[in-house]
A protein has these predicted regions:
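Short, low-complexity disordered leader/linker segments with a strong preference
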Residues: 1-26
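Early extracytoplasmic/lumenal segment of secretory-pathway proteins
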Residues: 18-88, 341
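A structural signal for short loop-to-beta-strand junctions that line the ligand-binding cleft
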Residues: 27, 73-78, 96-128, 144, ...
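Short beta-strand->loop
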Residues: 29-32, 114-115, 130-132, 138, ...
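A bilobed periplasmic-binding-protein/Venus flytrap-type ligand-binding module shared by bacterial periplasmic
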Residues: 129-134, 256-269, 288-291
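Periplasmic-binding protein-like
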Residues: 153-160, 279-303
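Ligand-binding pocket segment of bilobal, Venus flytrap-like solute-binding proteins
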Residues: 171, 176-245
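An extracytoplasmic/periplasmic, membrane-proximal ligand-sensing/linker region
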Residues: 179-181, 295-341
């Protein structure tokens, strides 16, 4: 009878996909460097008792590490700030599909990977900010207009090696084609207020210091500046206003990108990982994101923070986000050809 019961339990375990090899932890390879992530993982640990371990590096390094580790990789999840990197990892065969009705119900359908290999947790817009003293909103219109010579010596932006700019250029390439984006990029270079340097915060600080009049930045950085404990950063944030480009009736909308997770092909803690992703896309966790990182929620039930709401709603470029990876190499070639350092 004892052996019979053991046999029955073994069959049930197979039928219901019991995984006796899963440990009480999750291992994440993360490109994200935000304090809110630590808070989210701590909240999850308290709720479930599942330990979250994080290794941080840039996205390409982490993807290469996953490739080299193969079936022996300890990683369960890969998280990055760029849909293009998620698409790259999927093309490399490093991920498996994420199957969860709860996640699919939580996340806006327009943001989720149509192939099922990655999910968004937040998104942001690549916006324009302009000097309150030297620029009027009526002077601004589109990304394309920034190449006009009227902006010569007035535009601030970070290096072409930055993933945010590469994603923007990829979206422009997909929407406009090679010839147009090469002309656009040349125009932007001619209009630089200075050689590209620093991060997005530094571009806003440069406007405040009178070194330029317009900057291309991620939307959440303005929220971070305005909520900073450093008065200099608050002052910089207050010196500019937010403008969402390409909002006209016949325009495509502003470029967005996501932060998102993929589950590794050989994830040793698959069920724990699904639990974490279900939590991170829940209303509770999404509210934590928007009120701490000033990103937009991937869950449409969650409103932006009060600061972000004050900028108003905007039309989103509905380009398939996987194309941010598809056109990445072409975007980099455009930067190189046009001298965008």
């Amino acid at each position: 009878m004892k052996n019979y019961l053991i046999s029955i339990l073994s069959v049930l375990c197979i039928v219901y996909s019991c995984d006796t090899n899963e440990s009480n932890e999750i291992n994440i390879y993360s490109q994200r460097h935000y304090e809110v992530d630590k808070k989210q993982y701590e909240n999850f640990e308290q709720k479930t008792g599942i330990k979250v371990n994080v290794i941080k590096a840039n996205a390409d390094e982490l993807l290469e590490r996953l490739k080299n580790e193969g079936a022996n990789s300890p990683a369960d999840l890969f998280v990055t700030v760029d849909a293009g990197k998620l698409q790259k990892g999927a093309e490399m065969g490093l991920f498996q599909k994420i199957n969860s009705d709860e996640i699919n119900n939580n996340v806006s359908k327009e943001l989720i990977d149509k192939n099922g290999y990655w999910i968004p947790i937040t998104y942001r817009a690549r916006i324009l900010v302009y000097s309150n003293d030297r620029v009027m909103a009526s002077e601004l219109s589109t990304y394309e207009d920034l190449a006009d010579e009227k902006w010569k010596g007035r535009i601030l932006v970070r290096s072409s090696s930055n993933a945010y700019n590469q994603a923007l250029m990829s979206s422009l390439y997909a929407n406009l084609g090679q010839e147009t984006v090469e002309k656009w990029s040349s125009g932007i270079v001619n209009n630089f207020a200075r050689d590209p340097k620093g991060n997005d915060r530094d571009q806003v600080k440069a406007i405040a210091a009178g070194q330029g009049d317009i900057a291309i930045v991620n939307s959440y950085y303005i929220g971070l500046l305005l909520s900073s404990e450093k008065q200099q950063e608050v002052d910089a944030g207050n010196s500019v206003s937010v403008f969402f480009p390409n909002q006209g009736e016949n325009e495509r909308g502003s470029h967005i990108n996501i932060s998102g997770f993929a589950m590794t092909k050989n994830a040793p803690n698959k069920q724990n990982s699904i639990k974490l992703l279900e939590y991170l896309t829940s209303v509770e966790a999404q509210e934590t994101y928007v009120n701490n990182s000033y990103e937009y929620a991937a869950n449409s039930l969650v409103m932006p923070s009060e600061i972000v709401q004050s900028w108003g709603e905007f039309k989103i470029d509905e380009l398939d986000l996987n194309k941010l990876g598809t056109y990445r190499n072409e975007a980099i070639k455009v930067f190189d050809k046009t001298g965008w350092k």
